[in-house]
Amino acid sequence: MNDVINSPSHYADAAVSITFEPVDLTERLPHPIASAVEYIIRAGRKNGCSEAVDLGKARWWLKRALIRFEFEDVKLDPLAARLLWHFAVYHRNTILLPLAERVDHSVITGDGIKITIARIETRLEKLEAE
């Protein structure tokens, strides 16, 4: 049974058993990045919201984050770094991967944000072509 309050299905991945909720990660991130991550994780999974709309919102939030963090790294605490890596790798979310790509995964860089925006735009182009 879907628990829409504590564990909404649009944040779940049927192929992988989730032991973490997105909120475990997003409450540890700066607001614009947290909002973008939420939209990326749920893209196309929430009833009434298309993948394109969710990714468009994620792109909007990442552009806001880029204005704020383009010239400085966003430092992550160890748990946030592990959770970001978990959602990017174990859930095969290639859009999230650039945010977690530093070797020690302890920072989000401006370049990582730019690459993530580019991956969102590529996915949006594919969705438009379908």
Predicted regions and their residues:
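Intrinsically disordered, low-complexity regulatory regions
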Residues: M1-E130
